[in-house]
Amino acid sequence: GFLGGGYGGGLGLGGYGGGYGLGGGLGGGLGGIGLAAAPAVGIAAAPAIGIAAAPATLVRTRVVPGPARLVQPPPVVQKQVIQPPPIVQTRLIQPPAQLVQGPPQVIHEQTPALIKTAVPAPSFGYKSLLH
């Protein structure tokens, strides 16, 4: 969902499926925040982002999936006793490893926007106007 989208010409793009949310806070300082997986984090971070987004600052909010780690389950020992005579067969069974997705991380990026300052041109012929 979107949070505070469209203040001051701000643009909010929410990417579903990819898990990425972009919020451009240009033109009044308030932009939309695209929430992909963590709405509580987005709600808590919305006022701070809106205030911090000065007209000279572009704040992008991305929701990046957390680090996926490989979880190796412990091996299972199977014992089998065959009678008679007492024969003990012990097998070590290793289950396949599972890929566990970690919690999503919300990354706030502040990129200074490019501000073109007007360079005053040297005023030629200024003294000639005074004569």
Curated annotation (Swiss-Prot):
GO terms for MF: structural constituent of cuticle
Keyword Repeat applies: yes
Keyword Nucleotide-binding: no
Sequence repeats: from-to residues: 37-40, 45-48, 53-56
Keywords for the protein's UniProt record, in alphabetical order: Cuticle, Repeat
Biological role stated in the UniProt entry: Component of the cuticle of migratory locust which contains more than 100 different structural proteins.
Domain writeup: The tetrapeptide (A-A-P-[AV]) repeats found throughout the protein are also present in many proteins constituting the protective envelope of other species.
Protein name as catalogued: Cuticle protein 79, isoform A
Species assigned in the record: Locusta migratoria
Phylogenetic classification of the source organism: Eukaryota, Metazoa, Ecdysozoa, Arthropoda, Hexapoda
